[in-house]
Amino acid sequence: MALLTALAVGAGGAAGAVARYAVGLSVGRRAVDTGLVNVFGSLLFGVAIGADFGGAPAVAVTVGFCGAFTTFSSFAVETVRLAEDGQRLAAAGNAVGTLAAALLAVFLGIALGAAL
């Protein structure tokens, strides 16, 4: 990885983390602010992919900013790409499987946390 690319990811990640924190402070309702950042992050990731500007700016936005701002954007892009590639069953499986796994992980995490 080139130094410029690594710095771009770091700068994007710092900006994404601060933006996520700011949204949480300003909205103040967890389900609402999470939904907002997930939808906006997906939109931004899609714009970056669609624009295909490549290089350090692309990874600053996608891996850095969106990665820190939300992880949902990557999931959404991957699912859409599967569907666009004609892999509709895989896209549906990815969507349902990821959501089910995430919900199960939260449930198990809560249970494990309560047991400590």
From Swiss-Prot:
Gene Ontology CC: one annotated term: plasma membrane
Regions crossing the membrane: 3-23, 43-63, 96-116
Activity regulation field: Na(+) is not transported, but it plays an essential structural role and its presence is essential for fluoride channel function.
Keyword match Ion transport: yes
Record's subcellular location: Cell membrane
GO biological process: cellular detoxification of fluoride
Residues noted as binding Na(+) in the record, renumbered to the chain: G67, T70
Name of the featured protein: Fluoride-specific ion channel FluC 2
Source species of the chain: Natronomonas pharaonis (strain ATCC 35678 / DSM 2160 / CIP 103997 / JCM 8858 / NBRC 14720 / NCIMB 2260 / Gabara)
Phylogenetic placement of the source organism: Archaea, Methanobacteriati, Methanobacteriota, Stenosarchaea group, Halobacteria
